[in-house]
Structures are given as structure tokens and as C-alpha cells.
């Protein structure tokens, strides 16, 4: 199936080949764990078990940042696992969320009552909290503060629906914007990045909001089937009486109009994303931050004006994902990627769409931040004969390439709520 998908995109197959035979390690070098303590090795094992996609880019980070971000992720994964567990009563869950940051300093605290699939991070929380306390104090301070603020925010939305667009921003801030703020503060604390990266919380927040809104928009049907609703009522109520009505065939035109309005809302974060990424100096941090963002941009382009969002899963191609991962290693390339997908959306804007003028306006704003005539060499300048040869080689060796690393599949399905 992946081979068939590549027929119309031979440059993507070329990049699949490059990725499989060594390109992956250039973007995400393999981490040497031989010198780690047993408890830290356990933490990295949990990291790989709970999110292979994040594990790959976290383990590629330089120096002290690697362990700090690993522990940061696991602490928030434990907090998120508590929040997601519907078998825990609200009365019991609220104090747990409010006090979770204090458990970082209690060596024996663990939670054995979760039924969630990632419950090992709660059941063996003493191992995670031990490594948290082994971090430099400057990292502990950031992680504990973000954990405290996120726990308060999660508790607020336990029995509360997302009503207005302002509430949507607030919810996304608690579950993702704070992550962006925390990561930025860790980058600056490590001194691999300038203090401004950690101080500009508005743009760090936008990085998280853009990813979270993309997930929420793309996952409409999955969330509906799971009894979850994250689309803001202020928007969808202008089209239907119940959010679930968008899944009905007779409402598909209204559904797509609402979809386009929410995508237009999310696009407003891209100028902040460009500014944020342009400030980064460390290559491992840049890769860590840029790859999820370009994946999200490609995902929004795939979702825009697309009825499939309300009928099944919308995914970017594996070859497309690999190409993005290998290209998004510098700012000119990232700008070229953004330019490409903004043009793709722009040319698909229906004149009859209620949000069409707003969509065109924000894309015009984004264009002003990008280089003129952006074009990725890797996507444009391979000769047809050369690419045809690659495709012929593909037909003979595809079985070998089906062993492509699972990390690409995880990135295609970017993010978790």
C-alpha cells in the first residue's frame, strides 16, 4: 500500500530509501544508554513504551536537556494518565491533580488504582520522582511549576465543556501550551538556547496550542466515538444543534464549513511558530521543535475542506512524513515547507466558504514571514529519469523497506490529547 501511495510522489520514495539506510540517524541519532543508572534506564524504557515518537526526538537532544526533557515528559504523562482515567471519581481525582506536583518530592508516593494503559508511570512513580530529584535544581523548579499549573487546569476542565473560542485557547493552554512554556524554560536553563526562548511565554504557548488544536481538529470522529468533545461550542453551534450531528451525511457541507473555520483559527498561531523557531540555535532543539510543527501544518492542509475528517482517519503519507522529518532541519527549509502547505490550502479555499476571507487573510500574513519563491530543492530538482530509476528499484526491493522504523508511523499519527 505504501508503495502504491509513492507512485505519484517518487521523491517521497527516494526519501524513504534515504531514511531507511541512514537518514534517520542524521535527524535522530541513537542514544548510548550504557552509562545510565538503572533507574534512569527504566525511565527511558517507560518513555519508549508510552510514546515512541516523542522518545526518538527526546533521545536526540544534547547534553543535560535529554534527561530533563525525558523526566518532564514522564511526569506529565503520569499526570495525564490520572486525568484520563474515567474509573477514578471526580471527588478523588481533583485533589490528586491539585497535589500532584508535591508527589515529586515524596520518594514513596505511587498510585496503584489506575486502569489506564500507561499506568506503569503511576505504579512506578518512585523511579521517576527519584530521577526528578537527581536533576539540577534549575530543571526541578521548571518541571514542578508546570506540573502544578497543569494539574490545576486539568481539574478545572474535568466536568466542564469547551464553550467559547477563548475557553478553547484556555483548555489548550493547560494541556499543551504549558508544555511548550516548560520546554522553552528547560532549553534556556540548559544554556543551549538564549534566555529569550524561555522568557517569551506567548510564543512558547502558541507552539503548544497549534499542535493541540491540530490534534483536536483531526480527531473529531475518534473523539466522538469515544464520548469526548473538544471543538468549541461557540463555533459548532452556529452550524448544528449537537456536535455529533456533523457525522450525519446530510450535514456534511455544514461540517466542512465548521472544520474550515477551526483550521483558520489554528493557522493564526503559525506566525508565532515561525518567530519561535527562528530564534533557536541548537540543532537538536531545532529538530525537536520543528518536526512536530511541520507535521501539524501538513496535517491541517490534509484536513482543510476535507469531508473525510467526518468519515474516518485523515493521515499524511508515510513518505510525506519522512520527507518532512529529513527536510525540517533548518529555518529556510521550514519556511519553504510552510509556504508549500499554505499555498496548497489557499488554492483550495471555496469562494462560498463563510471563513474564506479570513483564511485568505491569515495566509497572506504568513506569506509575509516567508522567503519569496520558497522551494525545497529535495522536492523539486531531481531528474525524472533518476526518480524513475529509484521507482524501478523500489518495485524490486519494497519487501525490505516495509521494515521501516515504527517512528515514522507514530509521527504520521502525531500527538495525543
UniProtKB/Swiss-Prot annotation:
Changing residue 45 to R: Influences plasma cholesterol levels; associated with increased total cholesterol and non-high-density lipoprotein cholesterol. Its cofactor is Mg(2+). The chain crosses the membrane at residues 284-304, 384-404. It catalyses: 2 (2E,6E)-farnesyl diphosphate + NADPH + H(+) = squalene + 2 diphosphate + NADP(+); 2 (2E,6E)-farnesyl diphosphate + NADH + H(+) = squalene + 2 diphosphate + NAD(+); 2 (2E,6E)-farnesyl diphosphate = presqualene diphosphate + diphosphate; presqualene diphosphate + NADH + H(+) = squalene + diphosphate + NAD(+). Gene3D superfamilies: Farnesyl Diphosphate Synthase. Belongs to the phytoene/squalene synthase family. This is Squalene synthase. It comes from Homo sapiens. The gene is FDFT1.
Amino acid at each position: 500500500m505504501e508503495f502504491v501511495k509513492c507512485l505519484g510522489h517518487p521523491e517521497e520514495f527516494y526519501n524513504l530509501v534515504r531514511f531507511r539506510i541512514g537518514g534517520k540517524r542524521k535527524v535522530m541519532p541513537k542514544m548510548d544508554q550504557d552509562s545510565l543508572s538503572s533507574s534512569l534506564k527504566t525511565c527511558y524504557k517507560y518513555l519508549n513504551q508510552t510514546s515512541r515518537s516523542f522518545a526518538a526526538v527526546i533521545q536526540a537532544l544534547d547534553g543535560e536537556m535529554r534527561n530533563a526533557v525525558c523526566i518532564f515528559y514522564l511526569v506529565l504523562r503520569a499526570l495525564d494518565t490520572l486525568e484520563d482515567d474515567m474509573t477514578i471519581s471526580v471527588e478523588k481525582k481533583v485533589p490528586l491533580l491539585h497535589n500532584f506536583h508535591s508527589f515529586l518530592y515524596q520518594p514513596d508516593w505511587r498510585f496503584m488504582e489506575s486502569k489506564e494503559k500507561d499506568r506503569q508511570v503511576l505504579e512506578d512513580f518512585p523511579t521517576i520522582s527519584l530521577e526528578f530529584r537527581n536533576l539540577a535544581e534549575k530543571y526541578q523548579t521548571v518541571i514542578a511549576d508546570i506540573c502544578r499549573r497543569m494539574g490545576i487546569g486539568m481539574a478545572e476542565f474535568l466536568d466542564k465543556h469547551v464553550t467559547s473560542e477563548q475557553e478553547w485557547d484556555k483548555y489548550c493552554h493547560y494541556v499543551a501550551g504549558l508544555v511548550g512554556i516548560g520546554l522553552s524554560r528547560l532549553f534556556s536553563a540548559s544554556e543551549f538556547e538564549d534566555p529569550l526562548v524561555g522568557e517569551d511565554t506567548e510564543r512558547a504557548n502558541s507552539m503548544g496550542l497549534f499542535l493541540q488544536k491540530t490534534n483536536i481538529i483531526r480527531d473529531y470522529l475518534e473523539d466522538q466515538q469515544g464520548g469526548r468533545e473538544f471543538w468549541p461550542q461557540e463555533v459548532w453551534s452556529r452550524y448544528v444543534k449537537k456536535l455529533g450531528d456533523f457525522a450525519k451525511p446530510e450535514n456534511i457541507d455544514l461540517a466542512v464549513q465548521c472544520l474550515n473555520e477551526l483550521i483558520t483559527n489554528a493557522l493564526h498561531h503559525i506566525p508565532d511558530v515561525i518567530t519561535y523557531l527562528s530564534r533557536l540555535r541548537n540543532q537538536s532543539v531545532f529538530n525537536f521543535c520543528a518536526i512536530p510543527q511541520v507535521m501539524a501544518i501538513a496535517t491541517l492542509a490534509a484536513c482543510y475542506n476535507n469531508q473525510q475528517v467526518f468519515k474516518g482517519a485523515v493521515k499524511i503519507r508515510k513518505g510525506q512524513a519522512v520527507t518532512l522529518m529529513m527536510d525540517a532541519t533548518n529555518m529556510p527549509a521550514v519556511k519553504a515547507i510552510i509556504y508549500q502547505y499554505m499555498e496548497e490550502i489557499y488554492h483550495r479555499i471555496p469562494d462560498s466558504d463563510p471563513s474564506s476571507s479570513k483564511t485568505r487573510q491569515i495566509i497572506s500574513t504568513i506569506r509575509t514571514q516567508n522567503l519569496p519563491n520558497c522551494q525545497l530543492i529535495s522536492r523539486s530538482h531531481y531528474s525524472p529519469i533518476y526518480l524513475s530509476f529509484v521507482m524501478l528499484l523500489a518495485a524490486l526491493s519494497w519487501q525490505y523497506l516495509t521494515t521501516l522504523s515504527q517512528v515514522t508511523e507514530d509521527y504520521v499519527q502525531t500527538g495525543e490529547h
